[in-house]
């Protein structure tokens, strides 16, 4: 009787001491998933850093209908804080949504500040907006991060991972990941030449933002 009890205890202890083994194939899958998680964590940190330089730009256009009621239409696009000139905060944005606007405002953490179009580049469809620094609170000024613009000149970018922030999917605050698929196409526009980069990121008709 005593011998049988000892045997049962030994069996239970052995079962508890031997965890279920994982096959090499399963271990490899787990490693790949962990690597993907690490990659997306890094991309997420980069996205959060870049978004510190992004703002939402709202353009308001007024019109009058057939019974003389005033109608307001709004368009929203993404803006990139690039610099200041000591008096104004300078923001780069697409001009398409702003072209016929009666008023333009920029959102700083939900606080709307009036902006004016300072410069327009018709060739690229970009505009520089200006917001007086005096209109921003000290907290807002301290929270501003100026974007660091990159250059693709002389760099082999095909196959490089990229992320689009701003409103790449047509919704504010969205983010898309992809890679550069080509960089060899040259664009000859008025008084200038540009290199066209393409990616495999889905392009929404209402998209705006930066890569």
Predicted regions and their residues:
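Extracellular/periplasmic catalytic domains that process cell-envelope and extracellular macromolecules
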Residues: 46-50, 73, 83-85, 120-123, ...
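Conserved hydrophobic/aromatic beta-strand scaffold that supports enzyme active sites
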Residues: 54, 80, 126-130, 175, ...
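Active-site region of chymotrypsin-like
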Residues: 133-147, 176-211
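Conserved active-site neighborhood of the chymotrypsin/trypsin-like protease fold
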Residues: 31, 83-166, 170-171
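A conserved glycine-rich beta-strand in the N-terminal activation segment of trypsin-fold
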Residues: 35-45, 61-93, 112-114, 146-148, ...
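Residue-level preference for beta-strand/loop junctions
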Residues: 73, 109, 172, 193-195
